[in-house]
């Protein structure tokens, strides 16, 4: 199983009952295709960056789930056909998903991507090399003659 994240936007003008029905439909597609919903977080109504299907606002939802590529294809097919879903995007998070490790991580409240311990010790690499002579007066033969 792989872990995926789908971010989608629902029409904000829908009543709460219809929005709940869309949520349940999406979760049921994941369950019916052998997937597990890891987290489902509604972000609320927000202004869109640009109009989508003549809407300037949308109800944002972030869902993490585990499954295979057929599940992703079926979920995206259902979202494409559902007029209540304005936009969506799916991203693969992990190649291998272990439900036991995920449960332990959630219990410990750790991020799903561990930070590299070496980065704190090493610090960040300098972006550019400091070159000699930048910001300093260059000495020429003429400057020495005047003195």
From Swiss-Prot:
Molecular-function annotations in GO: small ribosomal subunit rRNA binding; structural constituent of ribosome
InterPro entries from the UniProt entry: Ribosomal_bS6 (IPR000529), Ribosomal_bS6_sf (IPR035980), Ribosomal_S6_plastid/chlpt (IPR020814), Transl_elong_EF1B/ribsomal_bS6 (IPR014717)
Gene Ontology terms describing biological process: translation
Keywords: Ribonucleoprotein, Ribosomal protein, RNA-binding, rRNA-binding
Bias (Acidic residues): 133-147
Region feature Disordered, mapped onto this chain: 103-147
GO cellular component: cytoplasm; ribonucleoprotein complex; ribosome
Role this protein plays: Binds together with bS18 to 16S ribosomal RNA.
Family (UniProt): Belongs to the bacterial ribosomal protein bS6 family.
Stored NCBIfam families: S6
The name this protein goes by in its record: Small ribosomal subunit protein bS6
Native species: Syntrophobacter fumaroxidans (strain DSM 10017 / MPOB)
């Amino acid at each position: 199983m792989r872990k995926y994240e789908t971010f989608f936007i629902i029409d904000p003008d829908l009543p709460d009952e219809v929005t709940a029905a869309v949520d349940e439909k999406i979760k049921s597609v994941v369950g019916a295709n052998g997937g597990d919903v890891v987290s489902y977080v509604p972000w609320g109504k927000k202004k869109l960056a640009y109009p989508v299907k003549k809407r300037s606002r949308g109800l944002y939802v972030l869902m993490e789930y585990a499954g295979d590529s057929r599940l992703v294809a079926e979920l995206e097919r259902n979202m494409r056909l559902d007029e209540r879903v304005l936009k969506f995007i799916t991203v693969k998070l992990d190649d291998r998903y272990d439900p036991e490790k995920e449960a332990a991580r959630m219990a410990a409240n750790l991020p799903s991507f561990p930070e590299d311990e070496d980065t704190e010790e090493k610090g960040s690499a300098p972006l550019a090399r400091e070159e000699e002579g930048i910001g300093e007066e260059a000495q020429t033969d003429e400057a020495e003659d005047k003195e």
